[in-house]
């Protein structure tokens, strides 16, 4: 796994009237503070990125559909500099959260049928939004 990228298994609780999907607790590994949270949708076959956050740690969860994340490390001095990492998140296969450290490039691709939805949480608010 790339330095600065971690994947954390999450709880998916099946209940008769609608399932519960955990996302992030302040006691979870990968949580470094709260700045903002928002949802983003992506259509099947669409790609978004490349984007790099220099100060934010991102925690990403896909509760609907499937999204492939491609991460690139160009951080000078990093043991994984020059490497790519691909990780697909989906509630259907091993529901988990992706944590991405500051300074890494990231793009993502909609792999689920129809529209996929992802939850972004970060430790700092994006001042542009």
What are these regions (language model features)?
Residues 1-33:
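A short, N-terminal "cap"/entry segment at the start of jelly-roll beta-barrel domains
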Residues 76-78, 83-94:
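The conserved catalytic core of RNA pseudouridine synthases
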């Amino acid at each position: 796994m790339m330095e600065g990228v971690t994947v954390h298994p999450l709880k998916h609780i099946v209940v008769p009237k609608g399932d519960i999907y955990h996302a992030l607790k302040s006691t979870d590994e990968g949580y470094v503070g709260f700045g903002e949270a928002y949802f983003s949708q992506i259509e099947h076959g669409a790609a978004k990125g490349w984007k790099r956050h220099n100060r934010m740690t991102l925690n990403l969860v896909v509760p609907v559909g499937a999204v492939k994340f491609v991460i690139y490390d160009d951080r000078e001095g990093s043991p994984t500099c020059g490497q790519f990492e691909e990780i697909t998140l989906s509630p259907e296969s091993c529901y988990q959260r992706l944590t991405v450290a500051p300074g890494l490039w990231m793009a993502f691709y909609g792999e689920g049928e129809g529209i996929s939805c992802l939850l972004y949480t970060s430790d700092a608010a994006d001042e542009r939004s």
